[in-house]
Amino acid sequence: AQIPQPQAAKASGPPETVVVSRDGTYDEVIRQQQVRPLSGTLDEVPVFNSNSPEIVQQEGILLSTFPPEGMASPEAHLNYAFQGRFDLFAHHIARGLNPDDRRTLFLAVVVYNPGPNPVELQINQAVSYLSQEAPFINLPEARLSINGNIFAGPGSRTASDLLRGVTQAHWPTSITIPPGNVSLLMNMPIPLRQLKIPLDGTYPQGEIIPKPPQQPVFLAAADGQLQQETLDGTAPVSPPSAPRPIPSNGRTTMMYLTSSGPIYLASLARYANTTASGNEQVPSLQDWLQLLKDGRLAGPRDMPPSDPATYQFGRFYYGRVAGVARGSSWKTTLTDSSASSTLTIPDPGNSFSYVISSVDRNTFGTGQIQSAPMIVRYPDTALRAHGNYGVRYSLRLPLYNSHDVAQTISIKFQTPLGDEGLTNGLRFRRPPENRIFFRGTVRLRFKNQMGIEQTHYLHLVQRRGQESNPLVTLTIPPQATKDVDIDLVYPPDATPPQVITVLNNSATDVFQAQSSRPFAHPTLSQDF
């Protein structure tokens, strides 16, 4: 795509930046610059990825890698054994069938040891949060998160904890699965009402969950409710009431695991049993095994994905993931080339960007699809692990100043508008759309002018088309190199892709964001 020329006003300074007014309501900003694929690749660590169906209203099998033999629905079992290091990612939402549906949905993960010897499953790190434990609150564009207490949404909080190395106290360090046995790894509620029991999976199997308090029922006139009549003998007309909301709640779980032998896993969803008195009971391991053996895939099923190889027109559906993906982390050092050990900074006023979490049909013109490939999957689920939710990106930028004078460099994390036709450029929107495309924490490591290592966690909230303020600004002496390390666990509440941009501020910064919202904190600098 060519940079649009009609009614375009060029900003001063290199490189060419075009600002186009769109109906007087917003400006579109097109900046010519390099957009680079990320060097390196995903590792080979398998990921148990349970995300379809996202909304669960019919109990059943979410994802099973068990062998299909002897199962009532063999097509629901993908026959994949884990051994050694692997990850687990599960994100599901419980939603009632109507405003009065307050049943408690439980989410379980069971582990089967098919071998003749005990298998130890080490839980290296594990976190799980409900929506009410991490509500979607309004946060500024960027905020320092010193203690990990800045988050918005369960995906944001879960990914932030993983990045910090946090494990919740209720998880064991390991479990041992006897030969030929099945064990529960987790058995957690996704409640649709306030429960007076622990919600972290520690409430024992078979224990009673008190039934909800009885709500008053108001009868309509047609059902015999008495209404006061008006003077003319007719009943007063009541104003229409607002529709009652459907109860909904979500849970996001991520784990880093290591198995001493081959094991099979399954994630399952079922409602708590109901007693004769109307109370509920926590499902037992036997309940889950019966569902695993006799059950079908949970529902309702998500929209099937579009096939990039045969897609021609209309809306492109990525689908949601249910299967085993290959790739848990992407670790690389960004350099000028494979033969170089440094990354030369751009000339004054120039910038270049690297794509993060690029997907089919949205790579910012690089053609690089970073989505993890699927080892096994259900036919109606995503062809790749689009978004790389839960994948850890670890990037080192050895920034080299080839100039004879000091240069001031800014690093930005940005959410451009998708445009596959734009070559060597990025497109933004001023102001950005109101839709939030990224909520998550980024870790920065660098040395200040005194050579002291600095580590900062920044929680970011970005909207579609947002240019953003710098994450950090550094002054690099002539002919010197400064390392900057950027780490993030790509959060489930985000919409990919994004870019990491290196900008030379030593000339007029025509790329500076213009946002109606004030920045929440000063840009980090090497003296911060």
Identify the role of each PLM range:
Residues P178:
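Internal, well-ordered alpha/beta segment that forms a basic, Gly-enriched binding/recognition surface
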Residues L144-Q168, T173-I175, R445:
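Low-complexity, serine/threonine/proline-enriched polar segments
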Residues P6-L42:
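N-terminal low-complexity, Pro/Thr/Ser-rich intrinsically disordered segments
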Residues D27-N79:
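Non-catalytic, interaction-prone regions of core transcription and DNA-replication machinery
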Residues G13-G24, Q58, S64-N124, Y129, ...:
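Long compositionally biased, domain-poor regions of proteins
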